[in-house]
């Protein structure tokens, strides 16, 4: 049973690939289709990893999708106004960091709940995006260097390489470095973190800054793919991102959000949507599927967290019983 909960998403991913390959042998498991999935869904993975970071500390970033939206617009708009491509990229990343800082300060200093704070900042970003674009497409001549951001590295799509590198970095941070452990402690027990001298204000703010920059980077990659700015693009990445992060909490490290669980969840969602599309499913199936998966992911994540908590309580009780039963040596 433990193995099923740990590797369930991986098994599901393999089964989905096999099923869709059998149903569409000529089109599904082809280089073109695999490359298309990797390229298109790598942006989704970057957004999912951005919401994963504060979620470790039991905080939620609802501004991520709006951040992606305004970032992809600014990435082309600033270049259209004469800024070099690298300066535009740096400016967008700094904007993302500023959004994350604002979120962190609202949550840790003003004591606004993360749902409300990030929903508010996200709505502000949406309004600024609409004001900047005037509701129109933003067009500009993009240099080859910027377009190459979404090109290829060897035979792999560059966005997939970025997503893999970011995943590896976050895995190292959250599994092996004090910063990651502190954020997990803050998510599990803020009181215990306080007693151990862990500054909630500092680390939660840092988590939101990192999340904001990563969401902005996803917007930059997206703009390199689209090569046209649209104010309506970006928000649609939020729901699948939360679905992936929560669904990932049921696998690899059941009961807690984790990097590779999130990666597997994005892979499962991507393969399912691509497979259904090749089977001729209508356009509205994807949002129906994403919404259903979000509800399922929340339910499974809650159950996994409860099982993890029960195992911890049982282990503590067993340890206490062992200590009580120990013979007294006179």
Q: Where are these predicted regions, by residue range?
A:
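Hydrophobic core segments of alpha-helical transmembrane domains in multi-pass membrane transport
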Residues: 9-21, 50-51, 122-129, 162-173, ...
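Single transmembrane alpha-helix segments in multi-pass membrane proteins
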Residues: 15-23, 27-81, 105-112, 245, ...
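Transmembrane helix-bundle core of multi-pass membrane transporters
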Residues: 110, 114-177, 203-206, 225-234, ...
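Short loop segments and helix-boundary regions at transmembrane helix junctions
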Residues: 1-2, 60, 80, 97-139, ...
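Helix-loop-helix "hairpin" substructures at the membrane interface of multi-pass membrane proteins
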Residues: 84-92, 98-103, 107, 154-229
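Structural signal for alpha-helical transmembrane segments and their membrane-water exit/capping regions
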Residues: 14-29, 57, 129-137, 172-178
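Transmembrane alpha-helical segments in multi-pass inner-membrane proteins
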Residues: 215, 225-291
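Cytosolic-side transmembrane-helix boundaries in multi-pass membrane proteins
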Residues: 1-18, 168, 194-202, 274-330
């Amino acid at each position: 049973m433990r193995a099923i909960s740990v590797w369930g998403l991986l098994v599901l991913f393999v089964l989905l690939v096999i099923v869709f390959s059998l149903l569409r042998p000529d089109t599904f498991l082809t280089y073109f289709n695999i490359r298309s999935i990797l390229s298109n869904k790598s942006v989704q993975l970057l957004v999912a990893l951005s919401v994963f970071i504060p979620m470790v500390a039991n905080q939620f970033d609802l501004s991520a999708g709006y951040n992606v939206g305004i970032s992809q617009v600014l990435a082309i708009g600033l270049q259209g106004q004469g800024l070099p491509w690298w300066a535009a990229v740096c400016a967008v990343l700094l904007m993302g960091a500023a959004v994350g800082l604002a979120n962190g300060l609202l949550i840790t200093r003003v004591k606004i709940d993360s749902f409300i704070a990030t929903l508010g900042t996200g709505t502000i970003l949406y309004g600024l995006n609409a004001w900047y674009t005037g509701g129109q497409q933003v067009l500009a001549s993009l240099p080859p260097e910027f377009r190459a951001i979404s090109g290829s590295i060897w035979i792999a799509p560059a966005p997939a390489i970025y997503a893999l590198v970011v995943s590896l970095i976050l895995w190292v941070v959250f599994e092996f470095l004090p910063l990651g452990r502190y954020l997990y402690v803050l998510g599990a027990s803020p009181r215990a973190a306080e007693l151990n001298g862990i500054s909630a204000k500092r680390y939660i703010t840092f988590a939101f800054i990192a999340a904001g920059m990563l969401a902005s980077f996803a917007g930059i990659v997206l703009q390199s793919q689209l090569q046209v700015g649209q104010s309506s693009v970006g928000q649609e990445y939020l729901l699948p991102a939360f679905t992936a992060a929560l669904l990932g909490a049921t696998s690899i490290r059941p009961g807690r959000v984790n990097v590779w669980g999130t990666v597997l969840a994005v892979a499962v969602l991507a393969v399912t949507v691509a497979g259904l599309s090749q089977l001729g499913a209508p356009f509205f199936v994807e949002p129906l599927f994403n919404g259903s998966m979000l509800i399922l992911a929340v339910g499974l994540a809650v159950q996994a967290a409860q099982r993890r908590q029960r195992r911890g309580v049982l282990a503590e009780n067993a340890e206490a019983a062992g200590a009580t039963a120990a013979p007294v040596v006179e």
